[in-house]
Curated annotation (Swiss-Prot):
Gene field: rpsC
Pfam families for the chain: KH_2, Ribosomal_S3_C
Organism name: Rickettsia bellii (strain OSU 85-389)
Membrane spanning stretches: none
Task performed by this protein: Binds the lower part of the 30S subunit head. Binds mRNA in the 70S ribosome, positioning it for translation.
Family: Belongs to the universal ribosomal protein uS3 family.
Protein name in UniProt: Small ribosomal subunit protein uS3
The protein's assembly and partners: Part of the 30S ribosomal subunit. Forms a tight complex with proteins S10 and S14.
Keywords, alphabetical: Ribonucleoprotein, Ribosomal protein, RNA-binding, rRNA-binding
NCBIfam families on file: rpsC_bact
């Protein structure tokens, strides 16, 4: 089971080590709010591709307010000069949600080499620049261990190196206990749009076992 299911979704829950990316309570409005959250994430990811966004946590403490926490490798791109970009984003979200109270918090990801989303985006951007997929994967693996990663698994799927037949290449180093629920495993995917077609990138990073003071919210 642990080999097939999404490593992040497998560990989401109040007694497990991962938290939900959307936090709200709604009875009849659930579908509307869920679609709004998807549109907000799409807007942020499309507007700030260079910022390398890792996670977007959306909280709705009341019916009139929304709090958006954005984790990114380059937060300055999202903030913009004198806060111009974040003001544009805030106005766009206010228009989209019809809420008067929109709060946006930007957090910098310092250990970005053990953040699966950022690692996957980095590999994808290198593939788009025609860097060898083997070199991109090996560089990511080495950088991950330097920042404290205990295991990493990377896969690239598609017409690798311009080959006529699509295939999947894997690299794995260190431990990757996918069946262990207390194992803190980060997982993410990315897509590289190349002249040969789309190449899919998947990254799993094992950061160690969960302890009470290491709870990830």
């Amino acid at each position: 089971m642990g080999q097939k299911v999404c490593a992040h979704g497998f560990r989401v829950g109040p007694t497990l080590i991962k938290g939900w990316d959307s936090v709200f309570y709604a009875e009849k409005q659930y579908k509307t709010l869920f679609i709004q959250d998807l549109k907000i994430r799409e807007l942020v990811n499309k507007s700030f591709t260079q910022a390398q966004v890792s996670r977007i946590l959306i909280e709705r403490p009341s019916n009139k307010s929304i709090i958006i926490n954005i984790n990114a490798k380059k937060p300055n791109i999202i903030i913009g000069k004198n806060g111009s970009e974040i003001d544009k984003l805030k106005k766009a979200i206010e228009k989209m949600t019809s809420l008067s109270e929109v709060y946006i918090n930007i957090h910098e990801v310092r250990k970005f080499n053990i953040d699966a989303a950022i690692v996957a985006q980095t590999i994808a951007s290198q593939l788009e620049k025609r860097v060898s997929f083997r070199k991109a994967m090996k560089t990511a693996i080495q950088a991950s261990f330097k920042q404290g990663g205990q295991g990493i698994r990377v896969s690239c799927s598609g017409r690798l190196g311009g080959a006529e037949i699509a295939r999947t290449e894997w690299y794995i180093e260190g431990r990757m206990p996918l069946h262990t629920l207390r194992a803190d495993i980060d997982y993410s995917t990315a897509e590289a749009i190349t002249t040969y077609g789309v190449i899919g990138v998947k990254v799993w990073i094992y950061k160690g076992e969960y302890t009470e003071n290491k709870r990830y919210n």
